[in-house]
Amino acid sequence: MNLLKPLISVSLMTLISRILGFVRDILIASIFGASMFTDAFFISFKIPNLLRRIFSDGTFSQAFIPVLMEYKSDKNEKNIKNFLSSILGFMSFFLLLLTILGGFFSQSIILIRAPGFLNPPEKLILSTNLLRIMFPYILLISLSSLCSSILNSWNYFSIPAFSPIFLNISIIFFSVFFSSFFCPSIIVLAWSVIIGGLVQLLYQLPFLYKINMLVLPNFHWNNIGLLRILKKMGPAILGASANQISLIINTIFSSLLNSGSISWIYYADRLIEFPVGILGVSLSTVLFTSLAKNYKNGIKLEYKKLLDWGLRISLIVSLPGSVILFFLAKPVIIVLFQYGKFTDFDVLMTARVLKLYSCGLISFIFVKILSSAFYACEEIKIPMKASLFTLLLNQLMNPFLIFYFQHAGIALSLSITSWVNFLLLSRKLYQRKIVSLQRSEFIFIIYIILATLVMIVILFVVLHMMSVWNIGTFINKIIRLFFGKYVSGITYLFMMNILGIRLLNFFYKNS
């Protein structure tokens, strides 16, 4: 199987989703600005998203897919369906209970998440109401993640990658046409999240039916596969919780800063998640099932080659990407967000965060890939320990960095600790002789750096030619922005070609 083909497919779907996500954020910034209302929505929306990341997305798939691959290799359809039915029954019961409890304790959760919202009280009341509306999203999106994991195991990668598009379409549609029907109008965003999550789930069901894996839940929780997954999920949840606890504490810090800080961080976070999602998430998704399959079959050499291929692809894209984001931070934010109530000051504050986030872009992507390498071996404790250590380091650094850099200090702290996480994981893989920095790898890295340095020179020339970004129509600004990125990208590819790095050589065929 040619892994570059599904990678391109998943990346393309993710790109479409992220572009729609930017359209969504542009509309939110234009209609609602960076205010008490957007702070309330972003905080409320982060809570079900946080729980999703702890209990479903990464954590669940890391434990679930290797076990499912074992069932699949036995080629006993009845056993596979019984296993999936038990998983579905357990998840439905647990998530429904979590949704009910979350709705009941919404105000307390908001106060824990953002104690700065206690004053003014209107901010707390609004956040609580928004959270109660959106809490069922955790149920919908977690079941959608289960469907995605099953489809990925059958090599249906592009279908799950396409599903997040429906959430963005829902938010865009209801924001534009129905915001005037709600008071305050920000409530429309909460309902659009629920509708989008429901469509995400329903969209994948016909494809499960196509592969004959659409099952009904049962409540026989003594299934061996289910018990294995629950046993593995303990360390996985602890590791995922460490990352999310870090985000919670970061939000607590930001809620105590100037009004708008949460929104500035959110918009910068959305921009850095664009390349992380397109490359990091897409690549780790495609790699994970193949890594797990090769490890289960004892093909260690193929496993190592596959991981090396993923890391090289990541470096080729992420190094120039981080440079472009750093130097084009302000123009990108002006072009995408400076409309309506989004001011020059908002642009400046958001750009500061984005520049510091871009310093950690390479490590954000590398950590996802290296974590997948451990999860494919069913070795969950090492990423967990690394996450716990970086959580502690992150929070030790936060007060110091926030004192000097205000809200941007949170981004700098995350970038530094992400690099530490990468070094810890790579050291463990090096000790196991899975990764190594041999002469060929060292030369490859040097060549990528040289190509990037030449690109930086050309990028400075382009920026000098187009020094004013806040005038002109949206189309005019978009064309100028893409021209700068296009010229930089062509320069980078040209230099890689001169240095002997051919992209066609990265068509990897997995055995």
Swiss-Prot record:
Q: Which Pfam families match?
A: MurJ
Q: Which domain of life is it from?
A: Bacteria
Q: What is its main location?
A: membrane
Protein's membrane topology: Multi-pass membrane protein
Q: Which GO terms describe its molecular function?
A: lipid-linked peptidoglycan transporter activity
The disulfide bridges present are: none
Family annotation (InterPro entries):
Lipid_II_flippase_MurJ/MviN (IPR051050), MurJ (IPR004268)
**Pathway involvement of the protein, from the record:** Cell wall biogenesis; peptidoglycan biosynthesis
Residues annotated as transmembrane: 25-45, 85-105, 133-153, 156-178, 245-265, 271-291, 315-335, 356-376, 400-420, 442-462, 481-501
Keyword set, alphabetical order: Cell inner membrane, Cell membrane, Cell shape, Cell wall biogenesis/degradation, Membrane, Peptidoglycan synthesis, Transmembrane, Transmembrane helix, Transport
Gene Ontology cellular component list: plasma membrane
GO process terms (BP): cell wall organization; lipid translocation; peptidoglycan biosynthetic process; regulation of cell shape
Report the locations given in the UniProt record. Cell inner membrane
What PANTHER family does this protein map onto?
Answer: LIPID II FLIPPASE MURJ (PTHR47019:SF1)
Explain the purpose of this protein.
Answer: Involved in peptidoglycan biosynthesis. Transports lipid-linked peptidoglycan precursors from the inner to the outer leaflet of the cytoplasmic membrane.
Family assignment from sequence similarity: Belongs to the MurJ/MviN family.
Q: What is this protein called?
A: Probable lipid II flippase MurJ
Organism of origin: Buchnera aphidicola subsp. Acyrthosiphon pisum (strain APS) (Acyrthosiphon pisum symbiotic bacterium)
